[in-house]
A protein has these predicted regions:
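A generic alpha-to-beta junction signature in SAM-dependent methyltransferases
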Residues: 2-3
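Conserved catalytic/acceptor-binding region of the Class I
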Residues: 6-75, 86-98
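C-terminal lobe and adjacent flexible extensions of AdoMet/dcAdoMet transferase-like proteins
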Residues: 52, 57-60, 74-161
Length: 161
């Protein structure tokens, strides 16, 4: 309702494999020490699901793209500090509400360092989804009819190979 006809919607958010190393390390540590696990990293939407949502809510010319970034830290505790500053602490309803035990946290650090370190630093993956779409308006350009193009796409692609 707030987007005018022919208005451009732009959004970005963390998605899919963001913090996959942290998630893996927390799960392994908690399973080892507690015999089970409580989600410690919020789940992130899949790009395909976001693209489908853009179509379902009738955006014209929807585009969904993803940027992948690897960020390196001296220690997993530095990553946790940055996440807290970003406001990305866990807000899951199903999460165990008791405090994270220090032995679990320390084991998570060990697992993270053992599995995801390179040149003395740990890696954290961040995937950012970018979404754009136009609110429908009758003045928008319409796609051409199938087969109406003047250039064969296969031939056009061969020029760049």
């Amino acid at each position: 309702r707030s987007l005018k006809p022919n208005g451009l919607f732009i959004a970005s958010m963390f998605c899919e494999n963001t913090l996959q190393e942290l998630n893996y390390s927390f799960i392994k540590a908690e399973e080892e020490i507690c015999g089970g696990m409580s989600p410690r990293v919020s789940p992130f939407a899949k790009l395909q699901a976001l693209a489908s949502l853009m179509q379902e809510i009738n955006f014209s010319l929807p585009v969904a793209d993803i940027d992948r970034h690897s960020v390196y830290y001296k220690h997993p505790s530095n990553l946790l500090t940055d996440l807290k500053k970003l406001g990305e602490t866990n807000s899951l309803l199903r999460m165990n509400k008791s405090f994270l035990r220090k032995d679990v946290l320390n084991r998570m650090y060990e697992i993270y360092i053992d599995n995801f370190s390179k040149d003395g630093k740990i890696v954290a993956t961040f995937e950012i989804a970018w979404l754009t779409g136009w609110k429908y308006h009758e003045s928008q350009q319409k796609p051409l009819k199938r087969g109406s193009g003047m250039t064969n796409m296969v031939e056009g692609v061969k020029k760049f190979e």
